[in-house]
């Protein structure tokens, strides 16, 4: 038995004797491909490192083992904030250069180009790609913002700082800090409050309001720093209760006087304690032992209990609304709503989402869902799950499962499949068992309700990754699309008018989403699936409709649950919601820029669902009895907290009695403002107060003081902004000198609060802060009638940090997963190609006495195996070849996904046109473009070499298919389906028509290269006596088995020397052969 070697590439190598028609050149291609892929793998890993700040040392160390003959000496030290490269031994760079590099990296600026000269000299050769300093900008400057705890002020520290400064302006600056940053509750004591009040001079600024409404002021400006907020609030109440008598009688603000505020605050504390006790009620256990005679009773009791709690919380919020903007009270309300949300989730049971039309599989999936995500209220499902499986008689469970592979979509339900086979809802997959997995193709819809498909993530994954749907299943997908459309219309679609947020409606929405299989955890899984999915132009329209509807539902639910986790009817949530929407918008739009219209629908719905605001009627009740100064202060305070104008409020600006400088000229005032700006004293602005009513003061102060300060601030990087004092100085100056510009002041305060309280920067926070900075610029332009543009360094540094965060959270996981999968696949394919090339070098001879095949290369015997094992190996190789043809398509998909991710980054960054002039941002864009180019080149190289592998493998596979077809002619199935006579006749025809081929001469030293691959291949096919892991499924016996074994089976014993058998006609002559075949030729 031989192979046709004449189609091999005409290439000479040192492994083979010179010959125009050489076999081993094909194998050499395998070696070349392996070496090329090792370089490709390294470049790919470097791309990953650039994108994700990964430890490049691993890439370098792996590279050492590759056939490049280069050993590099790099430091092993890597920190979270920068890459530590103290020396470059290959190029002779000294330690001082490394220190210089680290210093530059720490400062988040582009390091001195000279620092990288030597590094680039060897990295160019190593990377095998054109290198430049710019390409490493992203890699060496990417950093994350350190988490900073919120800075609450200590009242004792403020008092000590005022000992040497008793001017009204110093006290105004102190109150500004308190109102911006808040006081730590544990620092607020009766004695300190009295000491602070006693320092306030009468008839100055809003000091009289603080003196008269002391309890309200400190409750309004105090944050609960303890983890036990209720205890912290009780201690605060105890301290504030002692200063009741210190306020003057006959105060004007009826609802904010000390006695009234203390009374309401005490009522709030008692109500919260009562509600928290009720929220500890174990009503989720009501379904553990359902009443046999009335299965609906427990559900009714539970529903009534939920409605009772909702009504009490609603009443609590309404009754205490006048203090619901005091920071200490707001934090208590916020904490209560978090507790309520957690409580509601932990009372959700399987019975709540079970419906009469559910199929057997629906019920199993819902049991698993409820027990996985809400175990505390679903412990009873452990027994119910087992009983349900034991009592099932009408459904053949075997039809649910797939035994043919381990594709990605199958793995989404892997643990669930184990739970079914073990009949154990608590089972976990530890790799100890082999079992079939739940089907993910559309055939599973025969057992799964359309409205429950989101409980089956594997099915969703499968549909997303199809280009076409079989015609017989299009009706199923149409039903799914109709169901999605119904969900969008009934649960998601925005109403024509937005009512105030209703707790009852929000909890109903939680229930509806859980009913179809969506909670915050499953939404995150689906967001990840959708983020990694990339539709192609040739995708069938019905699948595109499915994808758009799915994205609409999943992203709406995802944003809803994030908002719900943070919800409370307070200004805290109102500001959180802005940030959440910007963060999620950035994620969706950067993944798919064409989804911007879809995002508007999602955000409109979320805004409508979580609609909270302040009304003018509330403000009138809030300020009842107050004078204009009171109302002005309270309005500005509310605006600073909420950040929006919900209703107009007009007030007059009182003239300060200190303002006595109308007679100075504009030039003199300009000089004074300039001197103040250039002063080293942070409080120098206080000297401008006497001039604040001069007709030209506002314009001059903005131009000479505010604009240069804003320019300086926006020219900082974000980490420098966090430690710089000038922004808070600017806020104090504007609060003192421009009291009527509350919008400008609000945005400055917001920027400052953001800079000190931010946990991390992402694309959402960048969008918000960009908006704030340009709103500051817009207000400056309106006041000065000029065109002012802020500097871009601050926004660019935030943007780069934001994209670092995006790359780490979304691109990095995808790359990590893809690299693992792709390179595992490539390595397997290379091994397969080497095996195929090795077999092509052999000559196969069959021994008809014992049906054994010996494989040789030249005169060297390589391996001997049974005919049965040989054919099984051939079949296995053909099967692997077909599987590789399918699986290798994922590499092209990976390329498309990654390049689109990078392209979307470039598109998104370029959309910030105001920042494009910034050099650092241009370097960032250039870097991503270069990375994208190198990714394309790398994938192109992979594609070219894979095609060469395929050509090589196709030669062998075609030969093996011919061999298998000869065997299949005489297979038991063929004989059973036709007749023995016709099979023998066809076999004879094939045998006669088969041609032999010329055997090429192979050099002796090639045998050692080929032999291991052939030996390994056929050793793995030897029968073994080891015990296989038993399938947990019971295999049903069938009666339609073939009544005889395959004629090539090893269990048939051939009779040797048949000519010696009695009365047996045997001869080797042509006549004898003709005698045997003639009756079959008709």
UniProtKB/Swiss-Prot annotation:
UniProt subunit comment: Interacts (via C-terminus) with the large tegument protein/LTP (via N-terminus).
Segments of this protein annotated with the region Interaction with large tegument protein: 604-1082
Keyword annotations from UniProtKB, A to Z: Host cytoplasm, Host Golgi apparatus, Host nucleus, Virion, Virion tegument
One GO CC term, this protein: viral tegument
Cellular localization per UniProt: Virion tegument; Host cytoplasm; Host nucleus; Host Golgi apparatus, Host trans-Golgi network
GO biological process, one term: virion assembly
UniProt signal peptide: none
InterPro entries per the UniProt record, alphabetical: Herpes_U30, HSV_ITP
Keyword Disulfide bond: no
Domain of life of the native organism: Viruses
Family under the similarity heading: Belongs to the herpesviridae inner tegument protein family.
Entry protein name: Inner tegument protein
Known role: Plays an essential role in cytoplasmic secondary envelopment during viral egress. Interacts with the capsid via the large tegument protein/LTP and participates in its transport to the host trans-Golgi network (TGN) where secondary envelopment occurs. Modulates tegumentation and capsid accumulation at the viral assembly complex.
